[in-house]
């Protein structure tokens, strides 16, 4: 597959970056499949925990046992964690507290490819599959391709899947004119559900002009939405597909009164409309692979700046976020630690300033901070700038509280650290210890408490034997 990619689709820039030329998806008859994943984190080195796909003809869902554990944010987002029982690791749900059945990554990917090939086999008139995803960062296709690349399955994947289509920019284009800026999956689903419920209410009022009561069963729909956990990739895949269909149907109609849900319209017509709408926002698989390759090179350039921002990563979250932003901005423009050092050796600080002003993602004060940081790192006569962190008062209060508790035990202060409060109001030090029974005391018996009295001696003599006379009835025997 990689060898089949044309060299004209990428051109090398002066900075060493790989500029990907976007190729448009050719017109044809394709199957739309919404795909979602749950991962151990939000980095390319993380692993897939759950892989899910949804289409009008069926769905696919499989949990994957990762080699690494989920980070704290991923555990809270997906409500699953990795547990160890003896020598075995397994996934456990944090909602039901039950063990989740999972497979290895290669087995899950093979099942996913078999499912995609089965979809194409059932519809021989289709030319391929276009995968829908809703993500502003393009994280989902990169993670899927990274997993397929581990086991050399990209060629087989390319036989079925022709392109990836991102519904996030499509939603921003359609809803931007209405003043809607937040185009997250959850927000869009709520907006479209409200518009659908409002239109159904208007239709009921139009059908009952006399005011006759009409009962609509909205409780079942609400309970279904409430019971569906959006942290699961299986639920989100279905949400992506239904949201895209509803978005196209609402955009195709001019007035909200004529809104038609995808359930009432024919699925084939709705899918054709959706396919025509997502074509401008789709990207061929070859272009996505080249973008992934450039992302891996960008990560290598980011890691080269680690010595510069080492002090930033050792401080608070604010400085760590700024360090990540600076590294991404430098790496996206093709700079490395060695290339910036060559510029500094040639033109010193003015040369760095000329280069950093070309980064549009940085503000003026951020550019000045980054310039001073790089200049102090490259110049041996200067000390490297270290971020100044304001110490919060929590640690001081905690130490003072500990000191107060220690001094109160010594009886120097009263309750709450106030000398005017008597010590009788303070909490007692503890229960008086009860005297333990001493084995030696039991053996020696009561001791003489008078001063100068000799210690009691142990009684070793046995008591005198007592003669017992037999009863009279046994005397004649």
Swiss-Prot record:
<dbReference type="Pfam" id="PF22123">
    <property type="entry name" value="Exu_RNase_H_like"/>
</dbReference>
<keyword id="KW-0694">RNA-binding</keyword>
<dbReference type="Pfam" id="PF18609">
    <property type="entry name" value="SAM_Exu"/>
</dbReference>
<protein>
    <recommendedName>
        <fullName>Maternal protein exuperantia-2</fullName>
    </recommendedName>
</protein>
<dbReference type="GO" id="GO:0003723">
    <property type="term" value="F:RNA binding"/>
</dbReference>
<feature type="compositionally biased region" description="Basic residues">
    <location>
        <begin position="385"/>
        <end position="402"/>
    </location>
</feature>
<dbReference type="InterPro" id="IPR054362">
    <property type="entry name" value="Exu_RNase_H-like"/>
</dbReference>
<dbReference type="InterPro" id="IPR037998">
    <property type="entry name" value="Exu"/>
</dbReference>
<feature type="region of interest" description="Disordered">
    <location>
        <begin position="384"/>
        <end position="477"/>
    </location>
</feature>
<dbReference type="InterPro" id="IPR040941">
    <property type="entry name" value="SAM_Exu"/>
</dbReference>
<feature type="region of interest" description="Disordered">
    <location>
        <begin position="196"/>
        <end position="226"/>
    </location>
</feature>
<comment type="function">
    <text>Ensures the proper localization of the mRNA of the bicoid gene to the anterior regions of the oocyte thus playing a fundamental role in the establishment of the polarity of the oocyte. May bind the bcd mRNA.</text>
</comment>
<keyword id="KW-0217">Developmental protein</keyword>
<feature type="compositionally biased region" description="Basic and acidic residues">
    <location>
        <begin position="196"/>
        <end position="209"/>
    </location>
</feature>
<dbReference type="GO" id="GO:0042803">
    <property type="term" value="F:protein homodimerization activity"/>
</dbReference>
<dbReference type="GO" id="GO:0045450">
    <property type="term" value="P:bicoid mRNA localization"/>
</dbReference>
């Amino acid at each position: 597959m990689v060898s089949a990619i044309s060299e004209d689709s990428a051109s090398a820039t002066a900075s060493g970056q790989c500029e990907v030329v976007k190729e448009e998806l050719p017109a044809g008859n394709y199957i739309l499949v919404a795909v979602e994943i749950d991962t151990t984190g939000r980095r390319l080195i993380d692993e897939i925990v759950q892989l899910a796909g949804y289409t009008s003809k069926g769905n696919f869902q499989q949990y994957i046992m990762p080699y690494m554990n989920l980070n704290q944010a991923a555990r809270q987002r997906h409500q699953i964690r990795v547990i160890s029982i003896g020598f075995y690791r397994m996934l456990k749900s944090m909602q039901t507290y039950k063990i989740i059945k999972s497979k290895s990554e290669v087995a899950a990917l093979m099942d996913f490819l078999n499912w995609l090939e089965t979809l194409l086999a059932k519809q021989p008139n289709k030319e391929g599959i276009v995968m829908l995803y809703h993500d502003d960062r393009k994280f989902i296709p990169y993670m899927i391709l990274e997993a397929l690349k581990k086991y050399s399955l990209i060629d087989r994947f390319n036989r079925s899947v022709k392109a990836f289509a991102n519904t996030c920019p499509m939603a921003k284009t359609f809803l931007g004119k209405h003043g809607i800026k937040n185009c997250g999956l959850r927000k869009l689903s709520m907006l479209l559900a409200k518009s659908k419920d409002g239109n159904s209410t208007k239709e009921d009022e139009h059908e009952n002009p006399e005011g006759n009561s009409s009962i609509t069963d909205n409780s079942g729909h609400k309970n279904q939405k409430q019971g569906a956990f959006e942290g699961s990739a299986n639920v989100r895949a279905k949400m992506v597909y239904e949201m895209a269909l509803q978005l196209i149907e609402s955009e195709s109609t001019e007035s909200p009164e004529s809104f038609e849900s995808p359930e009432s319209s024919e699925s084939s017509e709705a899918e054709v409309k959706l396919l025509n709408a997502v074509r401008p926002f789709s990207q061929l698989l070859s272009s996505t692979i080249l973008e992934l390759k450039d992302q891996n090179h960008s990560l290598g350039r980011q890691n080269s700046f680690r010595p510069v921002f080492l002090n930033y990563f050792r401080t608070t979250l604010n400085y760590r976020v700024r360090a990540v932003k600076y590294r991404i901005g430098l790496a996206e423009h093709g700079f490395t630690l060695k290339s910036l050092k060559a510029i500094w050796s040639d033109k010193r600080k003015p040369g760095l300033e000329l280069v950093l002003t070309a980064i549009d993602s940085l503000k003026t004060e951020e550019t000045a901070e980054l310039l001073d940081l790089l200049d102090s790192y490259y110049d041996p006569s200067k000390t490297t700038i270290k971020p100044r962190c304001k110490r919060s008062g929590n640690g001081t209060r905690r130490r003072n509280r500990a000191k107060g508790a220690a001094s109160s035990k010594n009886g120097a202060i009263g309750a709450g650290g106030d000398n005017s409060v008597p010590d009788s109001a303070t909490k007692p030090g503890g229960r008086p210890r009860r005297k333990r029974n001493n084995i030696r005391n039991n053996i020696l018996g009561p001791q003489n408490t008078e001063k100068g009295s000799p210690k009691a001696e142990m009684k070793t003599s046995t008591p005198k034997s007592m003669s017992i006379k037999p009863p009279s009835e046994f005397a004649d025997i």
